[in-house]
């Protein structure tokens, strides 16, 4: 059985002091969670959040990383830095990174391979835009992104990768895919992983849904056979709301 994973991507929200307050409120609310719980604050909050969640069931994630260990890459953060402060997961290829910072499938793949080589678990985001959806290209776009992201990932490492299906048109818009629609796309992602790594490995890979996930719609998504959790945005900024999602 795949253990569900609920991750809260805070995006560019919460100063270090606000971050501490949020996780302190969250800890008692999720202590009995059956799902794996991950918080993903901005870089400047990571050290403080790591300190507060130490010894709890909450794991730490980062929102991005560069693929080199060190060097003249102004403004970037390396996997070595993340590992040292206690990061377990790293989000790679979020649609906002692809859109605003022009991340390509090739860059996403470099980051995935680098994360795995430094014992970080990638949460790889894939998803189609509204125009791509309307043109009937959902599967083409999402499965291509999946294949490109996983190039060179070993059979041994594939089960450490989490995929997050985030339809771009559903992020922060209040619109969301129906649980059935999301499940169909996620099933296709799993079938693609099976083509690359075999059915047994594909059955072990966790695939999340992301895109306007809230306390009142989480149970519908989690009832679907192939959805293994959620990558939560705005609702993860309020402890009570995120806890309701975690404890669906």
Swiss-Prot record:
Substrate binds at residues 9-11, 172, 212, 233-234. It is found in: Cytoplasm. One of its GO terms (cellular component) is cytosol. Pathway: Carbohydrate biosynthesis; gluconeogenesis; Carbohydrate degradation; glycolysis; D-glyceraldehyde 3-phosphate from glycerone phosphate: step 1/1. PROSITE patterns: TIM_1 (PS00171), TIM_2 (PS51440). CDD domains: TIM. Keywords: Cytoplasm, Gluconeogenesis, Glycolysis, Isomerase. It catalyses: D-glyceraldehyde 3-phosphate = dihydroxyacetone phosphate. One of its GO terms (biological process) is gluconeogenesis. InterPro entries: Aldolase_TIM, TIM_sf, TrioseP_Isoase_bac/euk, Triosephosphate_isomerase, Triosephosphate_isomerase_AS. PANTHER family: TRIOSEPHOSPHATE ISOMERASE (PTHR21139:SF42). Belongs to the triosephosphate isomerase family. Involved in the gluconeogenesis. Catalyzes stereospecifically the conversion of dihydroxyacetone phosphate (DHAP) to D-glyceraldehyde-3-phosphate (G3P). This is Triosephosphate isomerase. It comes from Caldanaerobacter subterraneus subsp. tengcongensis (strain DSM 15242 / JCM 11007 / NBRC 100824 / MB4) (Thermoanaerobacter tengcongensis). The gene is tpiA.
């Amino acid at each position: 059985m795949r253990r569900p994973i609920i991750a809260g991507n805070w995006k560019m929200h919460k100063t270090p002091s606000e971050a501490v307050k949020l996780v302190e409120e969250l800890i008692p609310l999720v202590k009995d969670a059956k799902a794996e719980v991950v918080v993903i604050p901005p870089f400047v909050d990571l050290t403080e959040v790591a300190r507060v969640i130490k010894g709890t069931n909450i794991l730490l994630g980062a929102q991005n990383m560069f693929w080199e260990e060190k060097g003249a890459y102004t403004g970037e953060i390396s996997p070595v830095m993340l590992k040292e402060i206690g990061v377990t997961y790293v989000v790679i290829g979020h649609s906002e990174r692809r859109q605003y910072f022009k991340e390509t499938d090739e860059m996403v793949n470099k980051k995935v391979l680098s994360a795995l080589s430094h014992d970080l678990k990638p949460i790889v985001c894939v998803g189609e835009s509204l125009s791509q959806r309307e043109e009937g290209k959902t599967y083409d776009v999402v499965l291509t992104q999946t294949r490109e992201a996983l190039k060179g990932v070993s059979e041994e490492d594939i089960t450490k990768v989490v995929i997050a299906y985030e339809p771009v048109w559903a992020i922060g818009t209040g619109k969301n895919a129906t649980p059935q629609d999301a499940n169909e796309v996620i099933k296709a992602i799993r079938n693609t992983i099976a083509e690359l790594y075999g059915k047994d490995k594909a059955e072990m890979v966790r695939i999340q849904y992301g895109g306007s996930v809230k306390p009142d719609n989480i149970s519908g998504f989690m009832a679907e056979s192939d959805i293994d959790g959620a990558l939560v945005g705005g609702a993860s900024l309020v402890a009570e709301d995120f806890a309701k999602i975690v404890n669906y």
